[in-house]
Amino acid sequence: SPLDTAYGAKIAEYTTEKYFMTELVDHLPLSDKVPSPQKVLGYAVGTPNKLTYTKDLYRYYRELAAASPRVRVFVAPEKSEEGREQMLVLVSDEANLAKLDRYKEITAKLADPRKLSDAEAHTLIAEGKPFYWASGSIHSPETGSPEMLMEMAYRLAVEDSPFIEDIRKNMIIMITPALEVDGRDRMVDLYNYRKANPGKPTPPLLYWGKYVAHDNNRD
């Protein structure tokens, strides 16, 4: 793939320790059809002093899915306690996504081995594809993963290296951009407040949501 050299320079600039840099992340592929996070959001993932609200995470994934047949977006029928959307993103090659219902069926059958003979299980395993689930921000102070997952989804959708092509061909990647959407946005609020008000006290813990101090949407 051609490289986005300007984005690659930002990766080098923003990476704080050399041991974080590997050949998998020290560059960004360039696409004339599929937008990078910077093209949609106006800044590169990992930009210092910048966190992204869930609505903007979702805006990026929707544009990614609109531009790439390797990406699909699903939204849960239920909203969070505070009324926010809850999104799931899938990345795989086009052939796998075309057979998504079949792969879901196989995975569901394999989940209960009591109903399968060994031979049936082996047949299903040979036909099926594993689902790999990456979730961001299980706890709201975990601020990095929702940012990073946007870049990971873009890499998986665009890059044509043998390593990435092998991933797309042989598995279906599920991404939850932010598992704890309410706390994520409140954490971004808090971070922006502290940036704008250096030295002032942090808002009290009651600021955090409708449950006692912490809402993980898991009750």
Label the predicted regions.
Residues 3-10, 53-60, 82, 144-152, ...:
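Stable alpha-helical elements in mature extracytoplasmic
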Residues 22-27, 71-78, 162-167:
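Surface-exposed patches in mature extracellular/periplasmic domains of secreted proteins
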Residues 9, 33-38, 69, 84-86, ...:
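Sequence-level motif detector for i,i+2 pairs with an aromatic at +2
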Residues 92-97, 102-219:
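Active-site/substrate-binding loop(s) of hydrolase catalytic cores
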Residues 1-51, 59:
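N-terminal pre-domain segments of enzymes
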Residues 15-18, 22, 65-68, 156-160:
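Sec/Tat-exported extracytoplasmic proteins
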Residues 49-96, 101:
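A non-catalytic alpha/beta surface segment that caps or lines the substrate-entry region
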